[in-house]
């Protein structure tokens, strides 16, 4: 660590959207954002779970628009920067400008781990707006460390000043993380930061985040009570407690985060965010974590096991954006019974 302060990036109000089908109220957003700000996290990501303009038939409709959520959070923070997520092909540069006007100052431009080339326009435009611009390589387990580093280099070339290893499936272990960060560090400029976005499907979210920091990672994503897709993200309060034990500088108030997790976030969960049969299957099969609720709906509709659907999706190497294929897979399984 060399005494540097970690950048703590909260994702409760974006990845956490998946856990409650994108149904946060504006008052929920205000309360959670204020609590996070009071606890001194560095940034608070706010958007539909699938990023700007994710509210749709395919991904699920949100209770409010991205801009309403962003404005609600921006109104109550004094310290933290408001971040947002943009997936090229779902959100556009016009949506990004609107998010900036609503108060977002950080954007993470997210692509599948082998498709960084679709992010050029969005990264360049974010830099023109003066935003803190991050490249976000989703499903990072699905390509080799060397290929991931080449994709990271593309994003750096477009103007991203930080590149994330994103374990969207919660499928990686500590060795996988170390290999990817070493590859990125060898390829990127020394001044380009790196970040880690973990999911907890194999209960390794915190361990993988620690491994990333040990390899020189600058920014850590986490969420209160692990609120996120699948078994959730690295739980923020747990990561901070572990970082404290390691003597790392993080600048946040552990007890305030613990209170916010239990008092504000956990009561909102209509399905427990935890490692269980279905979420473990996600991590084991390497499936996009936000498929969970969609798979459970399809399983109930067609009289199937959600685990069987998830395992088949993993075999077919489905990636984020292919939510519409969940019903196809379910119908195939039913017809083959």
Swiss-Prot record:
Gene Ontology molecular function: any one: 2-isopropylmalate synthase activity
Family annotation (InterPro entries): 2-IPM_HCS-like (IPR050073), 4OH_2_O-val_aldolase (IPR017629), Aldolase_TIM (IPR013785), DmpG_comm (IPR012425), DRE_TIM_HOA (IPR035685), PYR_CT (IPR000891)
Keywords, comma-separated and alphabetical: Aromatic hydrocarbons catabolism, Lyase, Manganese, Metal-binding
Pathway stated in the Swiss-Prot or TrEMBL entry: Aromatic compound metabolism; 3-phenylpropanoate degradation
First-level EC class: lyase
pH dependence: Optimum pH is 6.25-6.75.
Catalytic activity: (S)-4-hydroxy-2-oxopentanoate = acetaldehyde + pyruvate
Binding site for substrate: 14-15, 168, 197, 288
Site (Transition state stabilizer): 14
EC number(s) reported in the record: 4.1.3.39
Residues at which Mn(2+) binds: 15, 197, 199
Other notes: Presumably stereoselective for the 4S-enantiomer of 4-hydroxy-2-ketovalerate.
The protein, known as: 4-hydroxy-2-oxovalerate aldolase
Organism: Escherichia coli (strain K12)
Gene for this chain: mhpE
């Amino acid at each position: 660590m060399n005494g540097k302060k970690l950048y703590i990036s909260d994702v409760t109000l974006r990845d956490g959207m998946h856990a409650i089908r994108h149904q946060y109220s504006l008052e929920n957003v205000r309360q959670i954002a204020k609590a996070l700000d009071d606890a001194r996290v560095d940034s608070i990501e706010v958007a539909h779970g699938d990023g700007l303009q994710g509210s749709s038939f395919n991904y699920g409709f949100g209770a409010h628009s991205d801009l309403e959520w962003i404005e609600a959070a921006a109104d109550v923070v004094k310290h933290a920067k408001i971040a947002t997520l943009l997936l090229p092909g779902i959100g556009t540069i016009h949506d990004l400008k609107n998010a900036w006007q609503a108060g977002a100052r950080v954007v993470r431009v997210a692509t599948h781990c082998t498709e960084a080339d679709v992010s050029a326009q969005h990264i360049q435009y974010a830099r023109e707006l003066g935003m803190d611009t991050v490249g976000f390589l989703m499903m990072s387990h699905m390509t080799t460390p060397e290929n991931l580093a080449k994709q990271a280099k593309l994003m750096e070339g477009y103007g991203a000043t930080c590149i994330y290893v994103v374990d969207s499936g919660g499928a990686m272990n500590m060795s996988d993380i170390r290999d990817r960060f070493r590859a990125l560090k060898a390829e990127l400029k020394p001044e380009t930061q790196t970040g880690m976005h973990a999911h907890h499907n194999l209960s390794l979210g915190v361990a993988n985040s620690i491994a990333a920091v040990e390899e020189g990672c600058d920014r850590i994503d986490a969420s209160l009570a692990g609120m996120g897709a699948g078994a959730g993200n690295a739980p923020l309060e747990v990561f901070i407690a572990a970082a404290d034990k390691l003597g790392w500088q993080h600048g946040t108030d552990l007890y305030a985060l613990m209170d916010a997790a239990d008092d504000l976030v956990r009561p909102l969960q209509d399905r427990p965010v935890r490692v269980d049969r279905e979420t473990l299957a996600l991590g084991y099969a390497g499936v996009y974590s936000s498929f969970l609720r969609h798979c459970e709906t399809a399983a109930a509709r067609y009289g199937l096991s959600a685990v069987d659907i998830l395992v088949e999706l993993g075999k077919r190497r489905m990636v984020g954006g292919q939510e519409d294929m969940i019903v196809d897979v379910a119908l195939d399984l039913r017809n083959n019974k």
